[in-house]
Amino acid sequence: MTALRKLLIVEDDEGLQRQLRWAYDDYEVIVAGDRASAIDALRLHEPDVVTLDLGLPPDPDGVEEGFRALGDILRLKPDTKIIVASGHGARSS
């Protein structure tokens, strides 16, 4: 049996964490809710792919912390594939 590829989901919204975990059930999913946890998980698990929400605590309405996380990930593991996502600018109905 082959090992599942590892996916690190960096998302502070618990509902979205659950949805993404469900959507990627063919991956070994690791979840982090903030930049520090994401960097710890990156070092520990060495994921193949990272999905990164730009709106992370302490300012989930901004993008600065997400860009800091992106920079940290690229500096530590430059070959990691990263999918950047953000709800900023999304329309509410």
Role assignments for model-derived ranges:
Residues 1-3, 77:
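Short, flexible coil/linker segments at domain boundaries that flank nucleotide/cofactor-interacting
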Residues 2, 13-36, 44, 49:
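Two-component/phosphorelay signaling modules centered on CheY-like receiver
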Residues 52:
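Redox-cofactor binding/interface segments in oxidoreductases and associated redox assembly factors
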Residues 88-93:
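Negatively charged, flexible loop motifs adjacent to catalytic sites
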Residues 40, 55, 60-79:
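Short amphipathic alpha-helix used as the core "switch/output" element in two-component signaling
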